[in-house]
Design a protein with these regions (language model features):
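Binuclear metal-dependent phosphoesterase catalytic core
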Residues: 2-5, 23, 104-110, 133-177
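Active-site environment of divalent metal-dependent phosphoester hydrolases
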Residues: 15-19, 42-46, 64-69, 93-98, ...
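Active-site neighborhood of phospho(di)ester-bond hydrolases with catalytic His/Asp-centered motifs
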Residues: 10-12, 34-40, 58-63, 86-89, ...
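N-terminal active-site segment of His-dependent metallophosphoesterases
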Residues: 1-54, 65, 72-73, 156-159, ...
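Short, conserved loop/helix-junction motifs that constitute active-site signature segments
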Residues: 29-30, 50-54, 80, 106-109, ...
Length: 177
């Protein structure tokens, strides 16, 4: 039997740009079952009516979310299908100086996929098993993914990420607004 397919949106750093959030949701071919929000704009999500649309929200707090009176953690681990995901904004792992510290943490936690924001730079990197990370070889592959910034600005195009999971396989993608 084929495992179910999960379609998710990966969003980060909206910084008040709720119109961009609505535009991203409207553009999706598959209604996402969840939004994975990587911080800096938690307050913005309230205007989307996600519960009424049947879309779950899984979020972490960013460095600019302190004003939001949120109890979301700065990092979390979760499974989608059989894929273990490490979510973080990244400021506590200093990702603006590079993502290797965050990736080493995700690898120690047994993650298959690291999702982070904060830098506003959309990127994806696949690290095969055996790759040296922090002086230690990876025991299994790790994909490192940043969706960029929903808000745009700071010299960056507004962007988002998608994640499709089936069993223990997954595919990440980037989109621009």
């Amino acid at each position: 039997m084929t495992p179910p397919t999960h379609h998710l949106l990966i969003l980060s750093d909206s910084h008040g740009h709720t119109r961009n959030l609505r535009d991203i949701l409207a553009r999706q071919v598959h209604r996402p079952e969840a939004i994975l929000f990587l911080g800096d704009g938690l307050r913005d999500l309230g205007s989307l009516g996600l519960a009424e649309k049947g879309i779950d929200l899984i979020a972490v707090q960013g460095n600019c979310d302190g004003y939001s009176a949120t109890d979301e953690p700065t990092e979390r681990m979760l499974f989608v299908g059989n894929v273990k995901i490490c979510m973080m904004h990244g400021h506590t792992r200093h990702v603006k100086s590079g993502w290797t510290v965050a990736a080493a943490h995700a690898a120690r936690e047994g993650a298959d996929l690291l999702l982070f924001g904060h830098t506003h730079d959309a990127m994806e990197e696949y690290l095969p098993a055996g790759t040296m990370l922090g002086g230690v070889p990876l025991e299994k592959p790790l994909t490192v993914f940043n969706p960029g910034t929903v808000g745009g600005g700071w010299g960056k195009d507004a962007s988002f990420g998608t994640l499709t999971v089936q069993g223990d396989t997954f595919l990440c993608g980037h989109g621009k607004i």
